[in-house]
Curated annotation (Swiss-Prot):
Catalytic activity reported: Endonucleolytic cleavage of RNA, removing 5'-extranucleotides from tRNA precursor
Listed EC numbers: 3.1.26.5
First-level EC class: hydrolase
Protein name: Ribonuclease P protein component
Organism listed in the record: Blochmanniella floridana
PANTHER family in the record: RIBONUCLEASE P PROTEIN COMPONENT
Subunit structure: Consists of a catalytic RNA component (M1 or rnpB) and a protein subunit.
One GO-annotated biological process of the protein: tRNA 5'-leader removal
Lineage: Bacteria, Pseudomonadati, Pseudomonadota, Gammaproteobacteria, Enterobacterales
Family the entry assigns: Belongs to the RnpA family.
Gene Ontology MF: a single term: ribonuclease P activity
Keyword tRNA processing: yes
Amino acid sequence: MNKNHLSKRVRLLKINEFFFVFQKPQRIKVHSMTLFSRSNKLNFPRIGLAISKKYIKHSHERNRIKRHVRETFRTHKHNLLSLDFILTVHSKQILSLTNNNLIEELKKLWYHYQNYQQKS
């Protein structure tokens, strides 16, 4: 297996893991996306995605967004705190972003948590 893949242990997969984050989250909003986070008792960050058909009708667009979220998370996870993250989309405006712009917006989200880590 490729060592650069995103393993199952760093993904939120069960409904109770999502509910845990949504109970008392910290929130950050950037260009039609919201990143919810909550600390976990593990020694690594985890990511969950909640991207609904309500805002993004076509599956290929949802998959494009998910692919970029997972990839940017994978490249930044070593610098992040032990938090559970859930990314949601709250506007159709995200469809107007090019791949490069989307990646830049996602990097801003992860950068915030890298700064947050250094301040703590």
